[in-house]
Amino acid sequence: HLSTRRQRQMCIRDRLSTHNKGIPSFHYMVAMAGGHDIKCAKYATFGTRELSKNILRALKGRKACLIANHGQIAFEESLSKAFELAEEVENISLQYITSLKLGKPKILSINEMKKVLSKAKNYKRG
């Protein structure tokens, strides 16, 4: 059931954010968030300037990040694209947590991620 799957994905993402963990470049699709990794913004109380500053720091050069003990944020040129990106972050979170069950995943090099980021500018799904 789709809503059950979505709830599981959100739960996985929240596990990463509650541990203040970002997502390294274990998979090339991490680049869809705009960087070589997906950072996790430091925790601050909701609705505060401190939280806003922490999120902006984590988003620098990126389009999405996790937010410690909150969840995630994603932005794009349209609302529908922002939702697609948020879904991709959910999927990547699930893949990362799953891969950790087998041990530490192989991390792609910065040079490889630069290549991926360059190609990602023109990437269209579907």
Residue ranges and their predicted role:
Residues 1-12:
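Single conserved hydrophobic/aromatic residue that forms the stacking wall/gate
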Residues 4, 34, 58-60:
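Short, structurally constrained coil/turn elements
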Residues 8, 36-37, 63:
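A generic secondary-structure signal marking the coil-to-beta-strand transition
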Residues 9, 19, 69-70:
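Beta-hairpin (beta-strand-turn-beta-strand) motif
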Residues 13-46:
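Class I SAM-dependent methyltransferase SAM-binding "motif I" and its flanking Rossmann-like core
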Residues 19, 41-48, 65, 75-79:
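Short capping loops/turns at secondary-structure boundaries
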Residues 43-59:
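Active-site glycine-rich loop that binds ribose-phosphate moieties when present
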Residues 54, 61-126:
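A conserved C-terminal secondary-structure "cap"
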